[in-house]
Regions:
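Nucleotide-sugar donor-binding patch of glycosyltransferase catalytic domains
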Residues: 231, 261-309
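Alpha-helix C-terminal capping/helix-to-coil transition sites in glycosyltransferase folds
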Residues: 84-86, 133-134, 181, 242-243
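Conserved nucleotide-sugar phosphate-binding/catalytic loop shared by glycosyltransferases and other
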Residues: 10-64
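A donor-sugar binding/catalytic signature common to diverse glycosyltransferases
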Residues: 236-279
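Short, polar loop motifs at secondary-structure junctions
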Residues: 23-28, 90-97, 144-146, 211-221
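Conserved nucleotide-sugar donor-binding subdomain of glycosyltransferases
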Residues: 56-97
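Donor-nucleotide binding loops and adjacent catalytic segments primarily
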Residues: 8, 163-246, 296
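A nucleotide-sugar donor-handling region in carbohydrate enzymes
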Residues: 109, 115-191, 216-217
């Protein structure tokens, strides 16, 4: 959502009239960020993950049906909406069914190649490519030159013109002094998010290190060393990421773009079973020397090593 909102802000600054279509779980974010814009809360939840682990072939088949069902809902709503509304541009943030043949349609995504075993992903990738080819343009929020932030995920065989527009982040680097504290950025669905928060806080408290928790959680241990902030807007998160000496977070692509922008290493802990996060965490560990840890095997040693290492990061 944060990368999409960055492009929305750019469109508004250029003098364009913008309307937003989103799902219910995105409504609060967009209404807070853009209170004066028309917002259509009509789209399906876009949070479908390709999971690793046992029964992979069955899971992949199920995901193909889920993807296609979502894309059909997006396409049908848009087609009906355009019967009584006119637009010059349709800009889709990672929604592969949100396009129309009569309106110039642009897709914003870093994921043009699905992560995971190529042979098993042959059919899902063919389905994805078919939808990619229905857009007029693709914008990739990454650098054009190597090393890319998205690794192999942004490689494509699509016929559509793809342009690397650079990372999109609302969090900019500043020269504020850092505080000795660990910022834990929470994301993802419950109950996994609260279990993740509880494990991280417990391990950090064993080292006597101050911790700030950004994001909602139901089971954070109480301590004078723990500061719970709940939901943070982009301005608050910008300040926290710049001033915190250390950061622990998931390896979602939007978060990685923000880390690249502020030039700070974080301890990356991908959500267990989510191929894309696992793929990105491994790539950033190998390419950029970021520390990583397994969600199911978090240990004090992971934090000792990270807290004693430099957090300065330069892409090259």
């Amino acid at each position: 959502m944060t990368r999409g909102s960055e492009r929305i802000s750019q469109f508004i600054q250029e003098g364009n009239t913008v309307e937003i279509a989103c799902s219910e779980n995105q409504e609060s974010f967009f209404k807070t960020k853009f209170p004066s814009l028309i917002i259509h809360v009509t789209l399906p939840n876009n949070h479908i993950q390709i999971e690793s682990g046992k029964g992979l072939f069955f899971k992949l088949g199920l995901r193909v049906f889920e993807f296609r069902a979502n894309w059909k809902k997006e396409k049908n709503w848009l087609s009906k909406h355009l019967e009584s509304n006119t637009y010059d541009l349709i800009y889709s943030d990672n929604r592969y069914g949100f396009y129309h043949p009569n309106v110039h349609s642009v897709l914003l995504t870093h994921q043009l190649t699905l992560p995971g075993p190529k042979l098993l992903l042959l059919l899902p990738q063919m389905v994805l490519n078919k939808n990619l080819n229905r857009f007029n343009e693709i914008e990739i929020p990454d650098f054009n030159e190597e090393p890319k932030l998205s690794g192999n995920l942004s490689r494509t065989t699509s016929r559509v013109t793809a342009t690397f527009i650079g990372p999109l982040s609302q969090i900019k680097k500043n020269q504020s002094s850092t505080k000795k504290q660990l910022l834990l950025i929470l994301s993802g669905p419950e109950p996994q998010r609260s279990r993740f928060a509880k494990d991280i806080v417990e391990e950090t408290l064993q080292l006597g290190f101050p911790i700030v928790v950004a994001g909602e959680s139901k089971s954070i241990p109480k301590s004078e060393l723990v500061k719970e902030l709940g939901y943070c807007n982009s301005a608050e998160l910008k300040k926290l990421m710049n001033e915190s000496s250390h950061i622990v977070c998931r390896s979602g692509y939007s978060t990685l773009m923000e880390l690249a922008t502020i030039g700070k290493k974080a301890l990356l802990i991908p959500t267990s079973g989510q191929f894309e996060q696992e793929c990105l965490a491994k790539y950033w560990e190998e390419q950029f020397n970021f520390p990583t840890a397994n969600e199911n095997e978090i240990s004090t040693k992971d934090f000792v090593n990270y807290l004693n290492d430099s957090t300065h990061f330069e892409r090259r």
